[in-house]
Amino acid sequence: MMKLFTKDKDGHFIREINGIKLPFPLTEFMKVRKLGYILSALLMVISLFFIITKGFNWGLDFTGGVVFDTHFSQSANLEQIRSKLHENGIESPIVQTTGSVQDVMIRLPASNNDSTIGEHVKSMLQNVDKDIQIRSIEFVGPNVGEELAQGAVYATLATLAMVLIYVGSRFEWRLGFGSIASLAHDVIITLGVFSALQIEIDLTFVAAILSVVGYSINDSIVVFDRVRENFRKIRRLDTIDIIDISLTQTLSRTIITSVTTLVVVMALFFFGGPSIHNFSLALLVGIGFGTYSSIFVAIAIAYDVGLRREHMIPPKVDKEIDELP
């Protein structure tokens, strides 16, 4: 059986090394990195399978449709509005307030994109509020949705490229490679969950993906910085031991940060309403796997592609002393 916690010769868990106190017993994360690779590869293959076979359930932001800017004479009941639209055969409407509780934006799929839809919607909603006003109707064509989809892809790729440049310049290119692999891991699995469940993807999902990228890279950079610091402090240990010590040191910070963030995101998921439901779900999945990948993927891949002490700390060059009189 593989042991994760290291003991000293007296059988006690190691809690201090070279004067460095550890919040937990020294944990040998790198021993199980291959199991982590297998789990990550399995999850990514399953995610890619669903993405290829089922595709995505694109929202109105990408497929086009009709957007209504409406004003109610009293506080609008969003659930009642959705129910009334469903009763009249309109599927997947997006109903949310804009500014005040009386101003409501209604978005309908492209299948309802015709010249008389405004009067139909008004007659439906007059059963909810007879004094309803439709201030404007905007038709969004599929070409606009295609441009938004391309923009979302470009934004994600640009973010990954900037992360690679930043980590590679501040630390080392092997860490940049590990970071990109970790971020791709998080994004693909999140996309796979949405594809498998056929959850609607809109622009808020894109915002969630970019947030996950930022959150995950922040966790990884904390680990990278601690690895570099320990390379300077501890000279006699191998690279793999330094990484285990660094991960053990940052584990409490990683757990506390992740748990507190997930509690807030869960509150958004359960109590935030339909308009941010998919956004918060993407954050839940992405942050959860991002925490895992910052421990078991990013630094592990950097190590396996050759990360060593000399890559993080340049060798000292002795200065020549001019002894001429």
From Swiss-Prot:
HAMAP family: SecF_B. The gene is secF. It is found in: Cell inner membrane. GO terms for biological process: intracellular protein transmembrane transport; protein targeting; protein transport; protein transport by the Sec complex. GO terms for molecular function: protein-transporting ATPase activity. It comes from Haemophilus influenzae (strain ATCC 51907 / DSM 11121 / KW20 / Rd). Forms a complex with SecD. Part of the essential Sec protein translocation apparatus which comprises SecA, SecYEG and auxiliary proteins SecDF-YajC and YidC. Keywords: Cell inner membrane, Cell membrane, Membrane, Protein transport, Translocation, Transmembrane, Transmembrane helix, Transport. The keyword Cell inner membrane applies. This is Protein translocase subunit SecF. The keyword Transport applies.
